[in-house]
């Protein structure tokens, strides 16, 4: 029987989650805009994730926009103590489906209140600044998140798409619980950010963890997958889980079958030789 076998990490020191989570971007419509074609299926994916032992779900107000958060709030008991939900604010969507950074402190505060209502959570477990806005001083946006934490609106603060320098700047303002950057077995440009997270005991949430379409150049991945009777994507997830103790992969999908395949990857034990070859 498939179940989340990943070990645990304490987000912010007190929110214990299994390290393989679920990213809820794909439960929206095409292009991450609007309602999903099959709302019942989207709800089934969320419910099945929890049944499989996934207790960390990541979303954002820009997914839909608002659709992913609302479906989570309507489908799951978001106040249960054994389910941790992180969301993000600071990206807008336009009619062309562009992703537009917006870090104005007043906007972030209002966005948080809207996320809280959609998710039906008070406080929100983890609130992450989605992407630094070149038109807003980074420190101003982080101070806004610090105020949210001081006011009891959020339990922990995270960052996304940041550098080591920005992480350290933010740490001087408020305790940072997580960083969410692109990282996978095929793309390790942010290895320095991962190392900093390990140093500070900050959770590292690698987005695009499956590296779909980018695995052809990863030496040995198909051979290793065949050895474990697994898919190359399951090996990519297993590698992330074993590469560092602070990684919290959040593979997303709109399919229950794919969800179960992703969760099954948590039981794969790569050998030292296999890890070295993939690395």
Predicted segments, located by residue:
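Short, acidic/polar
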Residues: 35-49, 101-119, 163-169
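Beta/alpha (TIM)-barrel catalytic core signal, keyed to glycine-rich beta->alpha loops juxtaposed to Asp/Glu
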Residues: 3, 132, 136-279
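Structural preference for beta-strand elements that scaffold enzyme active sites
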Residues: 10, 17-21, 55-56, 82-86, ...
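N-terminal binding-site loop/beta-alpha segment at the start of enzyme catalytic domains
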Residues: 1-83
